[in-house]
Amino acid sequence: MSRIRIVFAFLCQLGILPASAAPAIDPAELEAFVDGVVHTTMRQNNIVGATVAITQKDQVILLKGYGFADKEKQLPVDPESTLFRIGSVSKLFTWTGLMQLREQGKLDLDTDVNEYLTTLTVPDTFPEPVTLRHLMSHSGGFEDRIVQLFGDEVADMQPYAEILSRELPDRVRAPGTVSTYSNHGVGLAGLVLEEVSGEKWGDYVQQHILDPLQMSSATAFQPVPEELAGQLSQGYAFELGKHVEKPFEYVPLGAAGGMSASALAMTRFARAHLGDGSVDGQRILSGESVALMREPLFDEHESINTWLYGFDNYSRGDTFIYGHSGGTLRFFTEFVLIPEYDISMFVSTNTTMGFRVIGAVLRGVLDRYLPDPMENVEPLPLTDLDKIAGHWSTYRHPVTTPDKIIRALQPVVVQPVSDNELMVAGLAEHPTYWRQVAPLEFKRVDENVSLVFQPDASPPRMLVGSVLRSYYKISWIESTNAQVQLLIVSLLMVLWVLLAWPVQWFKRRPSRLHATHGRAQLAGWLMAVAVMVVVGLSATLDDSMVFGLGTPAKVLLLVTYLVPLLVLVQLVTVARLYGSDVGRGIKFFHSLLVLIGLYLSWLLYYWNFYGPYPW
């Protein structure tokens, strides 16, 4: 979004210039349309409950609940009072609070955050300090961290300083170089808010944002206060053909995702940000701060949406759209603002896979009332394939800890499918197709989204739609495909050793084996046992890691140390085999087993299974 357009929008909100002609939205027709979309997608995806609010020009034109807040008790969703967990939409309240403190002259966005912290110090890994500007744009340079991101009991709700002193992710890149989502970075910003204001984050949000806006059916506290507990929706997963009610998900770093709110409450927060920072005479921000939060804060390329002051940029064509998404394991939320037409949308669901409902509603409403026609651009022949084809990884993953393994679950592959079209697998649930429209720039064939390659960056980078969706190129051996293929071959041989060697041992009897050969077989068999134990325990890892590591995972991390130790023993015994008179075939097989053991040991090292463990 250009700076001129930002100024124009700001003048419109002050009444100095007329706003653009708003799309004609008939509330009854809108309700019928949204009803159809929600009912269909809820049924298709087994969603228990959803809530929707749409406003235009300070008027609520759609406020509706769908399904149940509590299926067992048959309590319907009430859009005025039912609280949904809004996940990362909570971050907007953190940024709003920090902008309030900035207005009061209590902090500056370009000051080293260590200047505001008394309970911990951000390491000086790089010469450039981390600032609030970096944290607001997710460019602080921290690796991602998922273990213990959530909690399953109130005891997990510890002071921010304690959590971050123990779990602050490593700084793995210079600040301001890459925008990659960081919950812990926002938690750090929440700690700055606490230290500067002298109030706990939840108390601050309640007193300085929720109360002034009269958001009575919203809270920043966990667990939800007793007076609101009866209004909280349950969270659900669809497992083995039925809905399963799940416990309350605590978010220890609440500033990054711990709030709960009704659809009606969120319309008041929307009005404050769509207007001049006030609602019904109660001001939470100045008009200048509201306008500033719509400005670009992190920019990469003219065809790629920027990141704003705490907000994501969802702009389509010439229409400036911004907001934020949120998600826990069970709840999914989207909060969207369109200042040019004074429109807001809030959609939230209470069941796993609810993001499909949200996507259908938002796309449907935008396509219906603010269409974004496909640009008719003549595709160019593919060029620089050697620089763009291959394997890519998201920047958003752990780097130094064992939960780095989640990167293997997010493989992205770029490959040509014709003279002017690329297929990219891994960006969405299904492969997407792109046509080149400029050097190193592509447009999706079915949507106005840009993809840009930056092959001269170090490492080469790919941007998809938004600066926050950035990827870097990886080598073949680092790719999920290569590692899975090599792992399967290795495990087949290990499994053969595990099952066949004991049979051979008893069939031939130890006394008839060459002594050195027998020791080599025993060492190889023990290594095979350790490898299969690691594989078996790895299979127990799932999304419950976000609550912390269970006993199987902790045992796994201990057993992994046995693999390289037993490989070393195997290496010594094989070296002795070469000084004996055993056959070449036996020597070759044991040597191959050592190589496989070394590869598996390297693989465990590559994925940080040998530590460090900050948990």
Model-derived segments and spans:
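Short, conserved catalytic-motif segment at the N-terminal edge
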Residues: 25-84, 106-108, 115, 123, ...
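Bacterial N-terminal signal peptides
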Residues: 5-16
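Short, well-ordered beta-strand elements
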Residues: 324, 334-350, 461-465
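Peripheral terminal and inter-domain segments
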Residues: 22, 360-615
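Active-site SXXK
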Residues: 35-38, 58, 85-110, 186-194, ...
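Short, surface-exposed loop or secondary-structure junction motifs
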Residues: 66-70, 124-339, 365
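Sec/Tat signal peptide C-region and signal peptidase I cleavage site
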Residues: 17-21
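Solvent-exposed, non-membrane alpha-helical residues enriched in polar/charged side chains
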Residues: 35, 39-43, 99, 114, ...
